[in-house]
Every structure is written in structure tokens, then in C-alpha cells.
Amino acid sequence: MPPFDVVVVGAGPAGSAAAGLLARHGRRVLILEKDRFPRRKVCGDFLSASAADALEVLGLRDEVSAEAEHIRRGALAVAGGPEIPFRLPEAALSLSRERLDARLASWAQSQGAQARFGALVRGLERSPEGFHVRFSEGPNESRVETRRVVAAWGRWDAMDRERAQHDRQARGRRFLGWSREFAPDEDGAFAGRVGLYLFPGGYCGLSRVEGGGVHFAGMVEDSTRKRLAPGWDAVLAHARESNRPLDRALSRLTPSTDFKGAGPVYLAAKPPTEDGALMVGDAAGVLDPFTGQGLACALASGILAATTLERGFSGALAWDDVPRAYAAAWKDRFRQRFGWSAAFRHLVTRPRIARAAARWAGGRLVRSAIRRLGTGGDAARVNS
């Protein structure tokens, strides 16, 4: 019998959610995380109402809500076009990934999961009883045996490159992401609101996080970045020149950190299983950040993986059917959202089309996007 029932590769929101729930059911769980916490991540730091529902399943909603900024309204500013105000049907939460990831990983350990930070997974090999997982901690390489693997290694891990999972995405549009922190806004202009800004070849957003600081994150097409001078300052200058509301907003803010970049990013769904491993979070596909649903889908997919695995452990589902059942359930819950995300991406990254749509549809377009992209109930469905 392997020493672990499940090895979870990655301690982000999806991995910690899966690990904590499985450990809560008495399963022997090991988390292998290459970074040491707390850590900065390129992310929108936005927890939609669906994400709050997932936190409720974990028993963390009240705890996170008490610390986070509550977002109830916002505005979408189209480059060279109108600025469209909107209200969210349910309050969202804004909390830095440093705080969120550390809190979730600590919670998973409190449920009984073991965790090793600074442990870089080098490879997975099938074995008669499950998997051999190779990982290194500094110069030392080790191997551990497990019955199942949950892959929560993010959008483009070395494991993805080894397993050639990005061949299909590499033929698509490449994006790069960034984030930066600003000191608290003294006039409270961003209290309870989010600003979304479109510019040629990309988009970005501003929102308050815990403590009153303002978080800035965005995406730009690699083809657009290559036409600009090197560095994130050139991307920001391009965005500000194209979008006056963004320029006005940033002129009132003072940076408190340097830019942090990430990429390449391929915005597409990937297979939800790979050789028996269950893919969760960005490892199963990167949802467009402008949807505000990335963290919600990450948490919900972690919950789904744990729920499906527990059915296998308990005998309610045949053990060999676990990957197939997870893949079918993942597609049922998330595939349509990826489709709508791609459709709206073609709109928001094309300035002429975006301007025309904003002038013609305005608030109706924003409300439709919120309805199509922000469908709630994922966590409740997964947990049923």
C-alpha cells in the first residue's frame, strides 16, 4: 500500500481546496509546492460570488470575508469609447494572493494534509498501485508513492512542457500577464469598486485589496508587446495613452511594488485528466482574467476533484472510473464558461469592435457578460 492516498502537486487555491477536503475525510494527503509562502502571484485577486460559495464549502467564507475588500460596483472603460458603470448582482471579495494562498494552505494542513514547500516535482510515473512522484528539494531528489495525483501546478509548469500539453495552445494567441501594487488611495476612489480598462491588444483592472492598497493586473497579447519598447513600463504607457479613464485613475496612485510578470499564457481549456492524474485550476485551462471567475473555477475544480476521488475511495465509484468521471463532470461544469470567455475575448481585445459594441449595447452588453460568465452555483453543484 503506498504511503499516501493522494499527492497534490501545487498549493494554490485549487490544490489546497482538494487537499483539505480529502484530508478532512481521513485520506492521507501530501502537498508538494515548489514555492515558499507567502508569495506574490500575477492574478486579479478577485473572488466572485461563486468563489465565495466555494469558500463556504471549505468553511472559510466568513474568515476571508472579514479580511477582504467587498466589491459591489464597477466601470468598464473602452479605449476611445464610453465608460460603462455597472453593479454586481452579489458582492465580490478582493484579497491578495499572498494572503489567500497562505490561508488556504494553512487550512489544508489544519485538516490533516501534510505539506512540503520548496519541493519541485520533476516527474510522474505510473506504478502498479498508482504513481511514483519524483521531486527535488534543493540539491536533494526524492520519490514518493501515491494512489492518485491531483495536478494543481498552474498554467504552464515544467511538467506541462515534459508532457507536451501545450502543443495545441502554442498555435494560438499568446498573452503575457502582469501585476503591481499601489499604496492605499487616500480619496477612497476605489472603495468597493473595480475598474476594468480595455486597450489595443489587452486589458487591465484596478481594485482595492485588504488594508486599502490598490491592486493592478492586466494581460497583453505577445504580438502587441513585441511592437513596443522592452519592459512593462512601455506596455503601461501604451495602455494609458489609449484609455483616458485608466490614465486618470493611475495618476492618483503611487506604486508600492515593481511589476511582476508572467507568461506565456494560453487562454484555453486543456484535458481535465492526463494519464490518470486529475487536473485542477489553471492546469486544466486558463480562463480569461477579465471574467473575474478564475479563482472561482480553481476552487470549484479542486472541490470537484476531491469529491470525485472520495467517491472512489468510499467505493461509490469504481476506482478505475475516477478519471473518466472527473473529466465528464469537469466538462459539464466548466466547458461552457470557457466558450463564453473566448467569445467575449474576441470582443474586448479588438478596439473597433469593442467601441461599436459599447456604443450600441452599453450596459446591456456588460450585464450579459456578467450573466454568461458569472454563473453561480458551481461549488454547490460540485458539493452535492
Regions found by a protein language model. Name each.
Residues M1-A14:
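Beta1/beta-strand and adjacent pyrophosphate-binding region of the FAD-binding site
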Residues T224-T308:
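FAD/FMN-dependent oxidoreductases across multiple families
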Residues S50-A105:
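A conserved beta-strand/loop capping segment in the N-terminal third of enzymes
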Residues H70-L76, S251-A268, A325-D332:
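Flavin (FAD/FMN) cofactor-binding core of flavoprotein oxidoreductases
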Residues A23-C43:
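Glycine-rich FAD pyrophosphate-binding loop
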